């Protein structure tokens, strides 16, 4: 028997996003609803790699962040390569979203409360991990290659290095 979980849709401030009710840490799953991008990208496009202008991408990230209560104008994100590599993220790693990513990996963990972690999905799965007792969070891009290579195990190990306990 599977538990049914509903992901509420929130639409405000020019963007729409989903949340998971069983994750107490502030988070958002973006949608394509809202935004200022035009033409074939007409939506809440979050990537300059699709041919959108940096200004549109920056504004779309700003709108999503304003709607979700997150500072997405500076986030930690990576060039995702379907690996099992998970990095510990720090505030100094954050950068504007229209810049090329500094890191090549498929997940981040942090224990710094003001660090926003971002991972991108297409046909892969996101995993958000949270140890509320230790104040450690993780965001992981789970493609099939990374899943086979145990990216979630790597994320839990990195979280444990920051003081998390899997049972929490």
Give the ranges of each region predicted by the language model.
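Conserved nucleotide-ligand handling architecture
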Residues: 1-29, 33-34, 39
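Surface-exposed, charge/polar-rich loops and edge strands
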Residues: 2-5, 13, 114-116, 124, ...
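Generic structural signal for well-ordered, non-membrane alpha-helical segments
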Residues: 23, 53-61, 148, 152
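Residue-level recognition of the N-termini of beta-strands and the immediately preceding loop/turn
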Residues: 25-26, 73-76, 166-168
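Short amphipathic alpha-helical segments enriched in hydrophobics
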Residues: 29, 34-37, 65-68, 72, ...
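Short acidic/glycine-rich loop or secondary-structure boundary segments that cap or lie
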Residues: 38-39, 86-87, 146-149
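Glycine-/proline-rich flexible loop or hinge segments
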Residues: 39-52
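Phosphate-centric recognition/catalysis
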Residues: 54, 58-142
């Amino acid at each position: 028997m599977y538990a049914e979980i509903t992901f509420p849709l929130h639409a405000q401030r020019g963007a729409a996003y989903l949340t998971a009710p069983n994750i107490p840490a502030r988070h958002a799953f973006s949608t394509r609803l809202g935004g200022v991008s035009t033409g074939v990208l007409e939506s809440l496009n979050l990537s300059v790699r699709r041919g959108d202008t940096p200004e549109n991408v920056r504004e779309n990230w700003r709108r999503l962040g304003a709607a979700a209560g997150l500072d997405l104008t500076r986030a930690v994100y990576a060039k995702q390569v379907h690996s099992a590599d998970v990095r510990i993220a720090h505030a100094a790693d954050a950068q504007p979203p229209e810049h090329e990513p500094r890191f090549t990996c498929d997940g981040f963990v942090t224990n710094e409360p003001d660090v926003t972690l971002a991972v991108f999905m297409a046909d892969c799965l996101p995993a958000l991990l949270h140890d509320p007792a230790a104040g450690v969070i993780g965001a992981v891009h789970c493609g099939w290659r990374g899943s086979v290579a145990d990216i979630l195990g790597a994320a839990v190990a990195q979280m444990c290095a920051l003081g998390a306990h899997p049972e929490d």
